[in-house]
Amino acid sequence: MSLEKAVSSAYAAGCRLVFASGAELAAPEDMRVFRCADAHTAVYAALGASLAGRRVLVALGEAVELPDSRVTGGVAVLMPGAGGDFAGLREAFAASESGDAVVALAPDADYAAEADSPETGRYHKQPERFVADCAREEMCPGCPYRGVYYAAAKLWLRTIGDGGCSLLGGKRPFLALDAAWGRGTAAAALAGFTAAMPESVRDTAAVTGAAELTEGALRLLSETGGTLVIVDEKKGGGDPAGLCRRCGLEPVELEANDVNGIEAALRAESTGARAVIVRGECALLHRGGAGRTYETDPNRCRRCGACGRLGCPAISGRSPVIDAAKCAGCGMCAAVCKCSAIRERA
């Protein structure tokens, strides 16, 4: 199948970014083409790039079901069997943007030649449009995602989530999620976003569970850059560190209750791809403190609110009190307290 006319039409429409899987294509020198291992990686990388306001072309060698996602920049997918009736890619991108959806069209149609347009698009934070729904309102006491989002919110990072408990980073007090398309999408979406906005590598991260990692997304991320935080809840026998190394990312490994270490890892300057593995049991399955709980010393507490910004259900009040019945004993509150007012309960 020949994609030459479709690619030329996309370039003329201001598209300078292509994610291709199973499709051979030639592109102008200043059009960046990323080869993806699978269609899933290509599509969600394109959605991440769209978040940056860019027009993005996806070229697939097979027909797949496309996600029902909103877009900022237009996303056009060339794949066999697609029936989109467009005169050219300019019209397809305009339809994607006005319809707020991904559009699909045939790769080998006789698209008309058009005058070239420059690349356009700007990023705007719109979590209400791009974060998947989550029925729960707060993390459990001891949740291993808590320290990650505490640090992300403190550092004002642009953050892409995944599914499951990673969606709780969009709730109060964190409000740290910019986008989340569901399980198994965060790494690919991060790669797409940083491909579209290379200057965002230093202040953009994605958060995903260890079970959601795919080799294709990690290999793409190793090309584009960005920080991927992998929360390993120790539910299975996978080896996320080994998978990262095979894909060219040397991981930093930390415990979930090491809040200050997580913050330091996310604060570190980097212009490439990084993986931060945060290990901790799921709080629903394991009471992390093994009977240990914490309490506040009212004589030392300065009411600074640092422990409250963890969003732990066990902590309440302006002069914080820790409910021993709810406390999981993770010790994150003691780690963020700067005046040593939180200690292990005797």
Tell what function each PLM region has:
Residues 302-323, 328, 332-346:
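Iron-sulfur cluster-binding cysteine motifs and their immediate structural context
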Residues 17, 24-96, 163-235:
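Thiamine diphosphate
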Residues 116-150, 251-258, 264, 273-279:
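Phosphate/pyrophosphate-binding active-site segments
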Residues 3, 14, 24, 127-187:
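Active-site diphosphate/adenylate-binding microenvironment
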Residues 97, 101-128, 345:
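Terminal amphipathic helices with adjacent charged low-complexity linkers/tails
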Residues 190, 241, 255, 259-302, ...:
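Redox cofactor-anchoring modules in respiratory/redox and cofactor-processing assemblies
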Residues 71-109, 199, 234-265:
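Conserved thiamine diphosphate
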Residues 25-27, 43, 65-66, 109-112, ...:
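Flexible loop/turn segments at secondary-structure boundaries
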